[in-house]
Structures are given as C-alpha cells and as structure tokens.
Swiss-Prot record:
Belongs to the Tom34 family. It comes from the Eukaryota. Interacts with HSP90A, VCP, ATP6V1D, KIAA0665, AMPK, and DMAP1 through its TPR repeat. The lineage of its organism: Eukaryota, Metazoa, Chordata, Craniata, Vertebrata. This is Mitochondrial import receptor subunit TOM34. It comes from Rattus norvegicus. Keywords: Chaperone, Cytoplasm, Isopeptide bond, Membrane, Mitochondrion, Mitochondrion outer membrane, Phosphoprotein, Repeat, TPR repeat, Ubl conjugation. One of its GO terms (biological process) is protein targeting to mitochondrion.
Length: 309
C-alpha cells in the first residue's frame, strides 16, 4: 500500500527513499516523479534537490533493469550538478550493463578523479579494463572518448560533504583486499598489473601523484602480490600528505616483502608526520639492519630524535 504523503518535495523524497529501501522500486520511482513535478511547478530553482531526485529515480530504473531511462536521468542529474558521484556511478553501471564499455570507463574514471578510493569505481574499472582489452586490443586507451578533467571545486565539494555521503569509500580498502588478495592472478593479470604500475611510475616522474595513485590502485586490482606497487603508492600518499594511507600501504608492502627498504623508510616518514616517533624509530632501525649505510635513514633518525627532544 502506497504511503500517504503531503505535497512536500522533502516528504515525497523521504517516502520514495523508504520504498526504495523496501525494494519497492516502482513505487519509489513514482514518488520521485511526483516530487520532480512539484519542484518544477514551483518555478524556484533548486538544482541540487532536482539533481538528487533525478539520481534517485535513476537508481530505481537501474534496479528494474531499465538502463536507458537510468542513463537519461543520470545525465539530467549531472547537467544540474556536474561531477556528482552517485549519478556518475549509476550511469556507469547502466552503460556497463548495455556493454557500452568505453562510456562506462569514462564515468568510472571521472569518479576516481573526484575520490580515488571509491570501491565500486575501482572494481568497475577492473572489469571494464578487462573487457576493453579483450575487445579493442592493446591500444584500447587510444580509442576511448575524452575523459573530462574534474575541477578542484568539485573535488572540494565532495570532500566537504557529511560523512554519511562517503559510505562507499569507507569500505574501499577492505573490498580491495577481499576482491583481489584471495585469488592467484593469471599471467595476463600479472602483465596488466605490470603495465599499469609502469604507467604510475611515469606519472610520478611527471609529478602527477594523484593520477599515479589511480594507476597503482588499478594495478593492484589485477595483482595484489607486488610489494613495490604498494610502496610506490605510499610515496604518492606521502607527497599528498595522506599519511595514514601511506602507512597502510607500506604495511601491505612489508607483508609481501619483509626487506622492502623503501616501505620501511616511507612508513617511518608517515609515522613521523603522524607524530608516532617510537614507531618511526623502530622502522628506521629495521631498515638499518638491512642497509646499515643508508644515508637518508640516518638523517631521518636524527630528525625524529630532534622532534622527540
């Protein structure tokens, strides 16, 4: 039975959300449509509310397998509020379901420019990359549509949203581990991982650490057994002052290779930045047991000791 709701956009949207959570996608879609009509009839511009309603109705269409209307609504939502993550993800999923892999790839990559830890986008890129390599061959990247450059303002808008809007990112690291670490990569996956890691290395040389993180993350989706990929991504996190992420990546690197000197050094740097001087000194000590004459490590130890005094 449909809920009784008054002619309030907010109440209609809330009722639609409840129906969606209950799996009543048709009813939810109808409520979002009523809210859209009411909002548009008012004549007062509220692009963010209108964008959310289009995006929510798109989610209903996607659940019902109506990919064409999902894409239309996501495009309408993005026209109102460009670079919104949810409509980008939903449109990417719809494109993927329709086997429009190039368009799906563009939307997933756009999401990763906004937040490079969104699990569903990372997993989507993994699937789409395989499909594109199989269908278009080794030069598949040259055959893609242009990938839009996300302005800094859009990235800041996303990072400033309340924490409940970031639920997808909170699980990204654990999803990465469960999705990739429990399987042995094929020879083809190992090669793809190597190529992506090299692309990341080239981006680091050019000073583009944010895009390099994306490449390393893609590489790890194909093969999570390369210690150097984790320690290389840790370097990027350090440059971007993402110290906790750097520490986590170095820890993963050391699980794979307990003598990874760069991982010890970079984790020591991260601990120093986090003011965990005891852990920093412990990593430096471990490093110097492997390379007693490592100059940067000796210098870092002096800096940490000075900070402790």
């Amino acid at each position: 039975m449909a809920p009784k709701v008054s002619d309030s956009v907010e109440q209609l949207r809330a009722a639609g959300n409840q129906n969606f959570r209950n799996g009543q996608y048709g009813e939810a879609s109808a409520l979002y449509e009523r809210a859209l009509r009411l909002l548009q009839a008012r004549g007062s511009a509220d692009p963010e509310e209108e964008s959310v309603l289009y995006s929510n109705r798109a989610a209903c269409y996607l659940k019902d397998g109506n990919c064409t209307d999902c894409i239309k609504d996501c495009t309408s939502a993005l026209a109102l509020v460009p670079f919104s993550i949810k409509p980008l993800l939903r449109r990417a999923s719809a494109y993927e379901a329709l086997e429009k892999y190039s368009l799906a790839y563009v939307d997933y990559k756009t999401v990763l420019q906004i937040d490079n830890s969104v699990a569903s986008a990372l997993e989507g890129i993994n699937r789409i990359t395989r499909a594109l390599m199989d269908s278009l061959g080794p030069e598949w990247r040259l055959k893609l549509p242009p990938i839009p450059v996300v302005p800094v303002s859009a990235q800041k808008r996303w990072s400033s949203l309340p924490s409940e809007n970031h639920k997808e990112t909170a699980k990204s690291k654990s999803k990465e581990t469960t999705a990739t670490k429990n399987r042995v990569p094929s020879a083809g996956d190992v090669e793809r991982a190597r190529v992506l890691k090299e692309e990341g290395n080239e981006l680091v040389k050019k000073g583009n650490h944010k895009k390099a993180i994306e490449k390393y993350s893609e590489s790890l989706l194909f093969s999570s057994l390369e210690s150097a990929t984790y320690s290389n991504r840790a370097l990027c996190h350090l440059v971007l002052k993402q110290y906790k992420e750097a520490e986590k990546d170095c820890t993963e690197a050391l699980k794979l290779d307990g003598k990874n000197v760069k991982a010890f050094y970079r984790r020591a740097q991260a601990y120093k930045a986090l003011k965990d001087y005891k852990s920093s000194l412990a990593d430096i000590s471990s490093l110097l047991q492997i390379e007693p004459r490592n100059g940067p490590a000796h210098k870092l130890r002096q800096e940490v000791n000075q900070n402790m005094n």
